A protein has these predicted regions:
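WD40 beta-propeller blade core
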Residues: 59, 96, 147, 189-190, ...
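Short loop/turn segments that connect beta-strands within beta-propeller blades
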Residues: 61-65, 99-103, 149-154, 192-196, ...
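Bacterial N-terminal signal peptides
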Residues: 7-16
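Beta-rich, blade/repeat-based domains predominating
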Residues: 28-39, 45, 54-55, 71-88, ...
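Sec/Tat signal peptide C-region and signal peptidase I cleavage site
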Residues: 17-21
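Blade-level signature of beta-propeller repeat domains, shared across WD40, Kelch, NHL, RCC1
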Residues: 246-274
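A short beta-strand motif characteristic of beta-propeller blades
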Residues: 22-25, 65-71, 104-115, 154-162, ...
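Short glycine/acidic-enriched loop and turn motifs that connect beta-strands
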Residues: 48-52, 94-95, 138-142, 186-187, ...
Length: 274
């Protein structure tokens, strides 16, 4: 048994026993996103080496600490979301569907299906019907856009009228009829999907990446600054500034822990938030 596996087993044991402890799991290659399923399995997207094609993969950590590669033929996998026992992953300019049980992947939404060619597909979320919302960070300056991939296969650009506000959308979070957007430029927006309204609710998160939410509390990560924030009623509080590149965060199923992939450090940190 490797030292890495022993450390993961110890970490998961601490978590399962509700011991207040921050856990750091090492050994990933540019981890970008993370998500936990209802059974407690944790999935991590790993971009792999820079400028190397087809070395990206999805790794699963089960409750016993065993690591399994689900698929390993991706380019630069980033955002992850689970729906109907499948993983949906942004991978450069396509969205990939991953069959976890069979360990296979296929293109769910190809480049040519988008109304405008995507440049840098980044985060992804899903509604209760299976429609996917995907951010395209573009050139990280002013060409970003947000897509909806409907279950019918139709893809639309949404919030076209707000493109002067949306510079480089990164993190996405659906909460009922609200879509929250964290822009790379550091601004945090709330969009009403029914009223088609769009408003800024906070700013100052330079290199904004991931979003998580527990009741009225948001957790926001800054990739550029290596920071994790807590946001309540528009007021931000710094939780941790020790990361090298805090990427796409998520919550545990019980909403008591936040998972933070650190892309540059190659780690997954698990912090108690309750």
């Amino acid at each position: 048994m490797t030292m890495r596996l022993l450390w993961i087993l110890l970490s998961l044991s601490l978590l399962s026993n509700s011991v207040f402890a921050d856990v750091v799991i090492e050994g990933f290659k540019m981890p970008e996103s993370v998500i936990e399923d209802k059974d407690g399995n944790i999935y991590v997207s790993e971009i792999g080496e820079r400028d190397v094609d087809k070395d990206g993969k999805i790794t699963m950590i089960d409750k016993s600490g065993n690591l399994t590669t689900i698929v390993d033929d991706l380019y630069d996998p980033k955002g992850l979301v689970l729906f109907d026992n499948k993983l949906y992953v942004t991978d450069r300019d396509v969205v990939v569907e991953v069959d976890i049980e069979n360990k296979t992947s296929s293109v769910y939404a190809g480049t040519m299906q988008f109304p405008r060619s995507p440049v840098f597909l980044n985060d992804i979320d899903v509604d209760d019907k299976g429609n996917l919302y995907v951010s395209d960070s573009g050139d990280f300056k002013s060409t970003g856009q947000i897509f909806i991939i409907k279950t019918s296969g139709e893809i639309e650009t949404i919030f076209e009228d707000e493109r002067n506000l949306i510079k480089a959308p990164n993190g996405l979070l659906l909460d009922g009829d609200a879509l929250y957007v964290l822009d790379w430029a550091g601004e945090f927006f709330e969009a009403d999907l029914n009223k088609k309204s769009f408003k800024k609710i906070a700013e100052g998160f330079n290199g904004g990446d991931g979003i998580a939410k527990v009741k009225d509390t948001f957790f926001l990560s800054s990739w550029l600054e290596g920071k994790l924030y807590k946001l309540i009623a528009g007021k931000a509080e710094l939780i941790n500034d020790k990361f090298e590149a805090a990427a796409d965060i998520s919550l545990s199923q019980d909403n008591k822990k936040v998972y933070i992939p650190d892309m540059k450090a190659g780690t997954l940190t698990i912090l108690d938030v309750i």
